[in-house]
Amino acid sequence: MENNFIVNENEKRVLKQIFNNSNISRTQISKNLELNKATISNILNNLKHKSLVNEVGEGNSTKSGGRKPILLEINQKYGYYISMDLTYDSVELMYNYFDATILKQDSYELNDKNVSSILQILKSNINVSEKYDTLYGLLGISISIHGIVDDEQNIINLPFHKNEKRTFTDELKSFTNVPVVIENEANLSALYEKSLYINSNINNLITLSIHKGIGAGIIINKKLYRGSNGEAGEIGKTLVLESINNNDNKYYKIEDICSQDALIQKINNRLGVTLTFTELIQYYNEGNSIVAHEIKQFINKMTVLIHNLNTQFNPDAIYINCPLINELPNILNEIKEQFSCFSQGSPIQLHLTTNVKQATLLGGTLAIMQKTLNINNIQMNIK
């Protein structure tokens, strides 16, 4: 990393103001940070010399007249980040400029579940020397996994892939020579939701990620809560008593009976066919009774799970990241109706994740931005 990427504490404070306030003036920065204008001017000169910020024209003058204020913004073309989401059957890549604006996205299918194959895909398709019309090129990489990561950035559990005793972070650092951060996908979705301007007044929130498994990203007092070993939010492992195929009641992990993939598998078993996700939506919209019944059972179980989450953490809001609910928003309406019957206390906000398709990747972008800059609570306005 170039030396001009290193900033001192006052420079970090000013840089954060510019990240979090689009087209802000030095006068407003001075007021926000309670630093005199001369100090702010010196800091901004340093940041401009390092190519981290740009002047973008003039704002409106005050009612009393005088010089129009110079407005500032983050230099988008300083460099770029790559965020990766390792899904069950693909590797999703998002490239973002220094200000988090999306540069491009790529998707690669997995032919097998071996980590060695995944690393080979990355090494074959990431051109480390490519700068994409930026000054310094690649600045850092984030990795999202559907699994558990401890506080030392070690993968504790990777249920859908074969780890082969390979380490993503070490091998990618060696290949790219940039910082790498790895995190659970639900946690990254929660970081993204917390970072949005529209949620800036929310202190406590949960994102509920429902895909092949079920996980929760937990924000408490504006900070990600990971637990003692990174296992907080593994609510898909919650045990429920269930009778399957008319057998005696047994305890099952809730994600084994009502994750999105478990729901689709159950419907396929009952219909005796193999529906794609798109076909499932079509069957539901056409009023297929079996599909409607199983989705109703899914709604019932999800409502109970959300109610239990609410009683345990009492967040300001819960955001649901689920492609099925994104395609069939009436499911969320029914969950809300049932939830209101269960919950006797103060109402909470219950929403779809702001960006179901990109929340995890954008959360990864935020995580690596904050790591490389050593600045917390950067806000973004990308929906």
Curated annotation (Swiss-Prot):
The organism's place on the tree of life at top rank: Bacteria
Keyword hit for Acetylation: no
Coiled-coil region list: none
Gene Ontology MF, one: DNA binding
Gene3D superfamilies for the chain: 3.30.420.40, Winged helix-like DNA-binding domain superfamily/Winged helix DNA-binding domain (1.10.10.10)
Family affiliation: Belongs to the ROK (NagC/XylR) family.
Protein name: Xylose repressor
